[in-house]
């Protein structure tokens, strides 16, 4: 029986989340059912290669990583790299992707999502929460409400890291004892834009 073709994914943004996606899919191999075929990021090719190869948290990448022209080769996969500062600068349709995974954190409104769709992206999954629930067709925490997806959604958010950590526990508590109101305090790991010395910062 022929195997179904992998779901083709393009990453817009190759920071922490984008690189973790690539690593996770490569570690799972063909059984993941997904293949990253394109990356759009402003960094130069040498930096993309280095940051793929070395990770302070997860260690060295367990495979081959090399650059050839405008392609990042990871094991036996060839990933097309573009450096457009806007969604409109990438030919998503020409890349024949099934999904754009928006990992830059820059875009969080329905208007932003429409820019990807107008540029040829068939669907967009945002790795961050949106500005409001009106800005997305669905917000999904996997293991909690993914069954509500109909397949007609074009703009979906994977919520925030805090939401993904807290909601499964809150669901268990709600089922066991019932919850009316909750307050959550998050101790968050350092972000890539936070200085380690005293400096101005929006948060």
Show which residues each predicted segment covers.
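N-terminal Rossmann-like NAD(P) cofactor-binding subdomain of oxidoreductases
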Residues: 2-196, 200-203
